[in-house]
């Protein structure tokens, strides 16, 4: 029952997050529609409106079907875990690939339509625009990186509790909870470091607007990542409390741990959506926006510009995400290796639990011997 509840909650949350990020409304903003630069009059053309209506209709149907499938898959958990895990992995792959396919496919159709109709805004840029005054302004950028020592230190201090040390030495099952918690906080710390050191992006010919938007992005990223790390540390402390108090990590402990670990996801999502809304408000009031038609480098749905020295750039379709410059040496190799690693991990887990459910050792008892 607990397994059903945990995965049901995770599936519902995942579908909701994906819909908010990839399937939400796509209004005409910053001179773009679905990541494609278009004149306002072109965005109102009947064929463009029809394309976007089709995209919204298919998106709603796709997420509704996958919401129902995500609930149905969880019912298999009442039978055996290995068949459930296989079906869940298949559903997860279908859901992630389908969400990307819907978004990128429509983006490419809109780009092809733009080029066929000649709706080009200016000339494609080979290098990113720069605003030296905005780049020099670094104040008010959110919490410093040193603050991430706090959640990492809190997780490590759980090892000072005698009951926790005894549990880890005798049971060993708690190492996964505390180790994964520390890895999450270190990852959030590293992500904050990367984002805080990236160059300022130019949105406008007005330096004040550029400073406001870049300051907003760094503050939101900084605080959401730090708060997420603190809640992650709280999850580790909740598990450590059960280890020290009961010398056991049961269903209640895992449930509390899961809820506290899901709070960072809610914090990040809320922060990113709020940041995107506030950024649209700032740029909508900008009297001198900077429009650079670099759609040729985004025509496939990802960034591919050999003239740009950057490895990571702000994603065009999901502004609070980041895209790798696929024109860089090793970018494709690293992406394929990462996907292959995830695939091998999922297949390995499925095989392991299949063996545990159906191929493991058995014990038979008779009146004379075992």
Segments (PLM) and residue ranges:
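Internal/C-terminal transmembrane anchor helices
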Residues: 333-353
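Membrane-water interface of transmembrane alpha-helices
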Residues: 18-35, 98-119, 186-206, 269-285
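Alpha-helical transmembrane segments
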Residues: 2-20, 83-103, 168-189, 253-268
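Loop-to-transmembrane boundary segments
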Residues: 46-65, 129-154, 211-237, 301-340
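Juxtamembrane "helix-exit" motif on the non-cytosolic side of transmembrane helices
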Residues: 72-81, 160-168, 238-248
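Membrane-interface helix-loop-helix junctions at boundaries between adjacent transmembrane segments
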Residues: 79-101, 105-107, 116-142
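Alpha-helical transmembrane signal-anchor/signal-peptide segments
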Residues: 355-369
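Membrane-proximal soluble regions of multi-pass membrane proteins
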Residues: 20-37, 120-132, 274-327
